[in-house]
Amino acid sequence: MWRMTTLLHLTALLVLIPLCHCASMHRHDHYMDMDQTYPNGLGYCEPSGESSCKAGFSYNRDICQGPYHWHTISSCYKACGHKRRQSPINIWSHKAVFLPYLPRLKFKPHMKSLDTDVTNHQNRAPEFEPEDGDKLHVKLKNLVDGHYKFHNLHIHNGKSRRKGSEHSVNRHFTPMEAHLVFHHDDKKEIKPPRVKLGGVYAGRNKFVVVGVFLEVGDEGYGDEPDDDECKRILKGHCENNGDNGNNCDNGNNGNNDNNGNNGNNGNGNNGYNGNNGDNGNNGNGNGNNGYNGNNGYNGNNGNNGNGNNDNNGNDNNGNNGGNGNNGNNGNGNNGNNGNGNNGNNGGNGNNGNNGNSNNGNNGNGNNGNNGGNGNNGNNGNGNNENNGNGSNGNNGGNGNNGNNGDNGNGDNGYNGDNGNSDGRLRRWDLANVRRMHAERYHFSGGCIVKKAKRLSRILECAYRHKKVREFKRNGEEKGLDVDITPEMVLPPMKYRHYYTYEGSLTTPPCNETVLWVVEKCHVQVSRRVLDALRNVEGYEDGTTLSKYGTRRPTQRNKHPLRVYKNSI
């Protein structure tokens, strides 16, 4: 009998010794704090008995403070182990239920720039926290009431550079995932939604979290900003990075930040839509910067647009009034005051040897080639004495308005072309539209992927700054002031297709009171953003966030969660 007992003791020792050795190896693997513990041989962690909702936690999956055992750290974190509606999840796109009456995602007010404070959060993702979140609310009509105010913006990364998003769609992850967190105003009662998604806490969600998948890219993001440039960027000043968002993301026209009427702005590029939007019907001294350069879609940029105008010096050329800048409006290239560099309009005409000479009083610019056929003289090739080019108006089909019209060296719209006499886009115009469009976006899976250039510059500079990059103990944090527009993180309005479900916070205390809105279309930032985030120190020994990442593993709930979508 005693021999059997001895044999059992020896067997137990043989099993326990390797387990202890393995645990000791993990203890030295990475510093966290002196209270870290490890699962027993069965992978079980004893509850700590703590009740604080500020207890420390880790993303190291080998220890009891890691994401698999968050529910044992504190009784405040017990929801992390409920498995009822825990987030993040994998979303199967073909199983998501299409609801056509789901609202469009908006913010109120639109494009609001906020002063935020960003700090090193140790082993968690740095958070951009607004000084006054009451100034911005999420707007999801009929799905939630209007009292969810902006709480913070943070971005999750992974241990792997390619797998950093917390959510996934059809098991596909991206390098990062941005979360825009909105918290319901505690002073207001949560109103039940008209559109009910079901679930345990239907209509009782205290949070709305917008998740955006972030890709990384290299092209179109310019050189790495230096320290002086970062100081300007973080305070909201514009650098020449056109990007749909913020006050100065529509093309940075010279020194004017906002994309208003740019006229003589020096070297500014007129951005994606130029100054005049799609129709470019301004022509009043400020250059006509629509899609098609000076003439817009309709080529009606002059004050005197589409008429059969007499006297080419004072009116627009031809039947459809093509150049806009030829009118009586001061800064037009070909008009009475012809301040552009265009003068000499046309390859074939001598610009009015028989008329008023040189297209207006001051018209002889240096480089103006207003079309292959456009003879803008008063008696040009037209059949009518003072009607300029007769049916050829508009300075020809290929007219390039000199060195970019009134914007000095700026680009007047896509190509600064003068459009057609019938106001329609030429084939080469469409090609240029696509080319410029491709510089700012690319298409993937029926979505448009926005290249968030300005957001990239802000994140690069913020994560590189020592107040954010260097590890800080609790109470020693020094915040960095950053101006940011949360809407920069989102896809363009037209492409805000999303999945929605009722889940939980992805960090302790893992409260199951969150309405998730996960954007289907991705946003691209520069690869330098990912590098800078991974280099943020998350631990006192200088270990960075690249070691364990800041993503919670995909949760497998007891029952699949209902997921809905607002697009097919």
UniProtKB/Swiss-Prot annotation:
Coiled-coil regions listed in the entry: none
Q: Which GO terms describe its cellular component?
A: extracellular region
The positions annotated for binding Zn(2+) are: H154, H156, H179
Q: What else is known?
A: Sulfite and sialic acid may provide the necessary negative charge in the N-glycan to promote calcium uptake.
Could you describe the subunit structure of this protein? Homooligomer; disulfide-linked. May also be disulfide-linked to insoluble organic matrix.
Query: Major location, coarse class?
Result: secreted
Q: Which reaction does it catalyse?
A: hydrogencarbonate + H(+) = CO2 + H2O
Species lineage, top-down? Eukaryota, Metazoa, Spiralia, Lophotrochozoa, Mollusca
* PANTHER family with a match to the protein in the record: CARBONIC ANHYDRASE
Which GO molecular function entries does the Swiss-Prot or TrEMBL record give?
carbonate dehydratase activity; zinc ion binding
Q: Which UniProt keywords are given for this protein, alphabetically ordered?
A: Calcium, Disulfide bond, Extracellular matrix, Glycoprotein, Lyase, Metal-binding, Repeat, Secreted, Signal, Zinc
Protein name, per record: N66 matrix protein
Organism from which the protein derives: Pinctada maxima
Q: Where is the composition biased (Gly residues)?
A: 280-290, 319-352, 362-380, 390-413
- Could you tell me which residue ranges the Alpha-carbonic anhydrase domain spans? 55-567
Q: What InterPro entries does the entry give?
A: CA_dom, CA_dom_sf, Carbonic_anhydrase_a-class
